[in-house]
A protein has these predicted regions:
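Conserved N-terminal phosphate-binding loop of PLP-dependent enzymes in the Aspartate aminotransferase
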Residues: 1-438
Length: 438
C-alpha cells in the first residue's frame, strides 16, 4: 500500500479538530491483532480496542473469512417483510448470552441507533398497554447514549447538547455518581454513593411516577471517564423502577461482550434491565451493527392486531445486514472458542495493579478501573479544558501506543487478546507520557 497521503480536504471528520488534524495527520493503513500500522510504517499498539469495540483484536482471520464468504453469497437483503438465516441465528445467539429475561433482539447499525430504538420501544410499549401518559424519560448527568436526538436528550454530555439547541421535551437527569472527595482512587466499585439513587424517587415525586416511561443509564459511564457505579447503586435504581412500573434501559454499548469480564455489565453488577442496548463488541468493530434486547412482556405487548400487520413502525435499511450478521456470529464464536472473556477476567487484576501505581504521577487526581476498563483523570490546565489529556494522547501515540481521551481523562481498554505484558506496556506508556508533559 502506498505511503502517500490522500487529499485530506474534503472529509469532515467526526469528533475531531479537523484543522489541527489536517496539519498533523495520524493515518493508519493496516491493522493486525494488537497493532495498527501507520501510513509511514510505524507500529502503534491499540490500547483502546479501536473505539471500545475491537475486543477480538484487529483483522481476526476467522471473522475476516466469515465476512468475505458472506459477501460472496448474499451481499444484502432487506429485513422488511423478508429475512435470511444468519440474522435469525445471530438473534438466537445473543439471547442465549444475555440475562435470562431478555428474549428478543431488534437490530440496528450502531449504538446511537440502538438507543433511539430503545426509547421508541419504551414509549410505544406503554401506549400499547393503555398508558400513553407515560412520556417522560430520565437519563443521567455525564451519561453518553450516542448522538441521535433521543440519545443526546437523555445523555448528559454538555458539549454534545449545547451546539444543537432544543432537545426532546420531558427529559430529566439524575446526578452522576463521580465524587472526588469521597471516591478518588477507588479500586473497583466505590463504597460511597449508593444513596444517590434516591434522587430518582425525588424526580418521580416531582413529576408523578405515572408519567415516566423509562430510566436509561450505562452500567459504567465510559465516555464520561469510566465512572464505576457505587456498590448497590444500580440495584436501588432497579428497585425504584420496579416500584413505579418504569422501564429500566441499560446502555451496554461499551460494557457488553466481555469488557467487565462477564457477558454484560448487567451480569457483573447483578441487575437485569427491561431493555438493553448493544453494539461495538458484537462484531469486534468489523462491520457496523447495534441491537436492542427486550424482555418477553415488552415484545408481547406489540404482538396484537391482525397477524400480518406491522407491529412496530420502525427499522433501518441496513437492519440485520447479512455482512454484519456474519461478522457478529463469527465474533461471538471467536469469543467463545478462544476464551477471550476469560482472558479479560485474567487481565483485569493486571490492569488494576498497574493503573493504581500511576497514583502520585504528574497531574493525576483520580484513577478508576473495573474489568478490562481503566481511566486516569488529570487536573485540567486552567482555561484550557481537555488540553492536558490531549497532550498525553499525542505523547502516547508518538511512543507507539493508542489511548483514548474524554475531557481530561485518559481511558484504556485493551483488546481481550492482549497479554499481561501488553497491558503493562499500555499503562507504563501513559505513566511515561505523564512525566514528559507539562
Amino acid at each position: 500500500m502506498s505511503n502517500a497521503l490522500p487529499n485530506l480536504e474534503h472529509y469532515w471528520m467526526p469528533f475531531t479538530g479537523n484543522r489541527y488534524f489536517k496539519k498533523n495527520p495520524r493515518m493508519f493503513k493496516e491493522a493486525s491483532g494488537m497493532h495498527y500500522t501507520t501510513y509511514d510504517d510505524k507500529t502503534v499498539m491499540d490500547g483502546v480496542s479501536g473505539l471500545w469495540c475491537c475486543n477480538a483484536g484487529h483483522c481476526h482471520p476467522k471473522i475476516v473469512e466469515a465476512i468475505q464468504k458472506q459477501a460472496e453469497t448474499l451481499d444484502y437483503a432487506t429485513a422488511f417483510q423478508l429475512g435470511h438465516p444468519t440474522i435469525f441465528a445471530m438473534a438466537e445467539k445473543l439471547v442465549d448470552m444475555a440475562p435470562n429475561e431478555l428474549t428478543h433482539a431488534f437490530f440496528t447499525n450502531s449504538g446511537s441507533e440502538a438507543v433511539d430504538t430503545a426509547l421508541k420501544i419504551a414509549l410505544a410499549y406503554h401506549r400499547a398497554r393503555g398508558e400513553g401518559h407515560r412520556t417522560r424519560l430520565i437519563g443521567r448527568e455525564k451519561g453518553y447514549h450516542g448522538v441521535g436526538f433521543g440519545g443526546i436528550s437523555v445523555g448528559g454530555m454538555s458539549p454534545n447538547r449545547k451546539m444543537f439547541g432544543a432537545m426532546l421535551p420531558g427529559v430529566d437527569h439524575l446526578k452522576h455518581t463521580h465524587n472526588l472527595e469521597h471516591n478518588a482512587y477507588s479500586v473497583g466499585q466505590p463504597k460511597w454513593g449508593d444513596h444517590l439513587a434516591d434522587q430518582l424517587t425525588e424526580i418521580l415525586m416531582l413529576h408523578d411516577p405515572s408519567t415516566v416511561a423509562a430510566v436509561i443509564m450505562e452500567p459504567i459511564a465510559g465516555s464520561a471517564g469510566v465512572y464505576i457505579p457505587p456498590v448497590g447503586y444500580l440495584n436501588k435504581i432497579r428497585e425504584i423502577c420496579d416500584e413505579h412500573g418504569i422501564l429500566l434501559i441499560l446502555d451496554e454499548v461499551i460494557t457488553g461482550f466481555g469488557r467487565t469480564g462477564s457477558n454484560f455489565g448487567s451480569d457483573a453488577f447483578g441487575v437485569t434491565p427491561d431493555i438493553m442496548t448493544i453494539a461495538k463488541g458484537m462484531t469486534s468493530g468489523t462491520v457496523p451493527m447495534g441491537g436492542v434486547l427486550v424482555k418477553e412482556e415488552i415484545y408481547d405487548a406489540f404482538m396484537t392486531g391482525p397477524e400480518d400487520a406491522i407491529e412496530f413502525f420502525h427499522g433501518y435499511t441496513y437492519s440485520g445486514h447479512p455482512l454484519a450478521a456474519a461478522a457478529g456470529l463469527a465474533t461471538l464464536k471467536v469469543y467463545e472458542d478462544e476464551g477471550l472473556f476469560e482472558n479479560a477476567r485474567k487481565l483485569a487484576p493486571v490492569l488494576e495493579e498497574e493503573i493504581q501505581q500511576i497514583k502520585g504521577a504528574n497531574h493525576v487526581i483520580h484513577i478508576s478501573n473495573f474489568g478490562l476498563l481503566g481511566a486516569v483523570e488529570l487536573n485540567p490546565i486552567e482555561g484550557k479544558p481537555t488540553a492536558r489529556a490531549l497532550s498525553v494522547f499525542r505523547e502516547c501515540y508518538d511512543r507507539g501506543v493508542l489511548i483514548r481521551t474524554t475531557g481530561d481523562t485518559i481511558a484504556m481498554c485493551p483488546p481481550f487478546i492482549a497479554t499481561a505484558d501488553d497491558v503493562r506496556k499500555v499503562v507504563n506508556t501513559v505513566k511515561e507520557s505523564l512525566e514528559a508533559i507539562d
